[in-house]
């Protein structure tokens, strides 16, 4: 029976076309088919209910309903730089699926043959990146900078074309409790990943957010692992940085909410590799707010935008 299920998974992993959107969460999981229309308008004013982004989005939904799509949805991604074009679209159809079943079937993807990597390039390279870290650390000792967020890219070339559906299965197998996503892009590429962080979920007037700030590496030994989590929770530095994030989010959400609540202290959540400090934010939005206006209000999150 296990063998037949593994064979079934091998067949089904190819059934997610590169042009399909996939989203899996504890609250709703679904895939899409087809593309009725693409929406590339920049989201720079997306939080403004009277702005161009919101008006164009409403017009796109009106056109979809007029074309016979009974319950149109808009899916995709908004770039870090919201002045750049959005990567959103209205699919012709969508359907939900069982998250537990997908978590179970994705376990078999971890046993599939890995792809042959023929080139791996770090951008910037290690020496350059470490020099950037040294310079950033020195700057934080001056009044000019409080904190710096650094990142780098890894450019990988494989011998064969990457099967994004198979790669998604591996991500789910490694991160079954995360928010897993597969976003087709207008240039033919795919954005996919697994994140433990929730920017925004809205149901009716109620909304929820789970920002993360402050992390520690997991340890292979259970005792040391628990100790790493306790140290993170007790860390004055990490608690301070986490509070800067949550208070910044509270400041922008409060004027748009009729109710807003945050716990006094963060909680610990885990991924397979890291401990994180997290705070469950919840509230009730004002009557005219929609999910996109609140999401644009919060995007990019403070930790990503360099604050704190």
Model segments located where?
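Conserved hydrophobic/aromatic pocket- or pore-lining residues that grip, position, or stack substrates
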Residues: 143, 200, 247
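A short catalytic or substrate-binding loop motif that flags glycine-/basic-rich loops and adjacent residues
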Residues: 70, 191-193, 307-308
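Non-catalytic accessory segments adjacent to catalytic cores
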Residues: 49-157, 162, 258
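Short coil/turn segments at secondary-structure boundaries
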Residues: 25, 147-151, 182-185, 265, ...
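Contiguous alpha-helical scaffold segments within structured protein domains
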Residues: 32-33, 41, 96-127, 133-134, ...
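Short secondary-structure junction motifs
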Residues: 18, 145-147, 176-180
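An anion-binding catalytic pocket shared by soluble metabolic enzymes
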Residues: 23-39, 157-240, 260
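Short Lys/Arg-enriched alpha/beta "domain-start" segment
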Residues: 1-53, 156-161, 165
